[in-house]
């Protein structure tokens, strides 16, 4: 979703594009002496690749060292250039029977300058990918069936979340609906944040609020459940009251007024999107169509059919995104309330509470009814008023309203959240065959062919897209596979997830910068060139890059993929990493505040805030995250229990209580069973995850005896089906081990201080110290010049200190020591911390130098730059600009042209007249220009030239400010943040200037 907190695309001003003359030569800390460990062998990679697809290559390889130690290592494959992938996906160029090799490198290794060389042998074959059946092989236990126990960081965060939810004003969550549907608003608090009167995303926060209430209800104690239930019941009842106002019978049509009837095409083409029009649309709720429920008028999803751009003042924000949040909230209420038996019982003499005091099942049924009616509104609108046209140019595809190919390919405006997921889930929940079919059909109306088709063939079309706009679309596609059985949707999700793991994820599991994916394998460049400016246009490093919503949605996608293939431990390995690090660490442990962009890198400090679900998108996912930690702890089918996460819990399943006793985080866990059958036994198999990091000392004991001699990290170990009794005990021993999560690209430059945005460094691998599943960070390193170390090949210079006492949130605190510095888990940190270090792992000899001059990397970067120039030139040549905005914003584009010209000059030099250092610097500078460009509809810092002096003067030179001026300054500050972050639009700047000018004029200034 559109960002409203500090984060930045990493855009640099042209004046700051100069490079220092000499690279920083940093002192390195010597490694401990001893025999050097080197890679001895790497598992062979040989894949059959269905014709018309790009080979699926693993993102990590099982690696054996000279001393016998083994572990998983990350790999970078050298076929990631888009043109290369497109060629490999061509059946003409790569026909059945062709065999070829893809080169790759184990990253972080110094055998060569690029890493340890590996290769994949690929054979093109006929047929399709093998896919699992279109049904879950295992399902997570219902949220209400699992309860986190003890006093630890998990329960601390959960309780803080529930307390926050109970403190929120439910009337504020209902205000916009009553306002939109013409109901009285007296006694209702006006909404704020992104649900405020000046935003067009109203309703998104209420949707998150409903989901959070449901999850909290499943996780809370009895007393809290009573209070949560009152809120759930009230919000469901009042939303139905609003929805019923759209049930309008039309005697001429002899049916209810439907979604398809709203705004016929001629009228639609004339509709405006400004605030005056918005206020008029609110008066027309009788014509929204049967079942429409949203906090914004039906005009806004209709305007998307005319390809109206993201522009909060003049057009739309993301109307289907808001619809999704509300659908999801209602579905979550229906599911949870349907799972938890109970009825509200008012004690004698107790005052009447709002609501009718339905049973839980009645509340669930009403929530489902509301969601179903809204889902069928979506089906009706998209079925009758939209279509898909994929051929022709953009102008031809947009010649007629309603082309979904174009609608869902728009930046932000076309953001639909998890519409497909919610509609597919609704299809599973309703019983009427016609309604089931229509809801499933509606789910696939949110297919995005421009994005889906390449990724389904394993072509990485993820690059440069808006991250959180697209992750939920993949989750929805996967969910629809259950109903439609089309392998296309499973393959799409499988490919997407694996591309993310290898090419885009950071150590904590998060992704993106400025809400965007950059080029594949460029995480370190993106992190190190991310900057922000102050009001005087001074530029500073900005580590706030990984949007927390992305972590939320990647966890959800991972959980669903695991349901189809629960024996693939890689899914829960990743889930554990993103949960234990970014998600758990995204809330302040002492007072409620969650992160929007998660801080990553050098001297990073988490920007806690977003105190309400409506404050921002991440404020919304934030209230959900911390009341559902247990949702993927256990998976089950008829005969098997998968223990996927090791956390202190009690769970109910199959006539038994499952108790897992451990600390959190856990190096040891004990699992027992308490059957409540007449016989005192219950039969099933148990599968326990061996985490990817469990490379030393891992063991599983059943009643005191080890069940295996060896265990393969990143796998499951099965205890076959047996009769379990209360006397049985499973012990899992899993000592946390040290390892490195490496960035895939070497660091050769970074923003290092005020107006030092591109300080050069000697190229070096960058990595994060991991302690078991935990990302470790230190508050003791603040600058890159102090962050370069030589590391012993066997990590003997890393001291694992184990767990100490209470860390302030009642959990044991794991620490490690390295190079004289203390490291603590990232989730624990609330101050400044450094996650990544420049690490030189000692080798048996110097890295093998490149033979002669190698221009291949520069050549590839130039090709990417030329693709962008071609797209810009094609748009420039259009007589009628469709879309209205250019592909790339002008200042960033000009920087690209400048760096491209310089790079081509270097490329043209004879190999005898150029050095490798010169080539590498040219490639790096051009790569920065590519990775810091913005879409053409977004403002750039240069566009603040009128606003910045005005707001600075208003702050510094006008005493005794009026309320109007203070509010105008606050608004201007927000806009400056948005633009510097890479998320602001020109209309916001214009509005900020006008507000300041008017406020100053009213003061006589």
Which residues are covered by each model-predicted region?
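Solvent-exposed beta-strand/loop surfaces of large extracellular or lumenal domains
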Residues: 695-720, 740-747
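Aromatic (Trp/Tyr) and acidic
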Residues: 132-222, 260-284, 298-343, 347-358, ...
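Short proline/glycine-enriched turn/loop motifs at strand-loop junctions of beta-rich domains
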Residues: 56, 681, 690-696
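Helix-terminus loop motifs that line ligand-binding clefts
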Residues: 225-309, 504-516
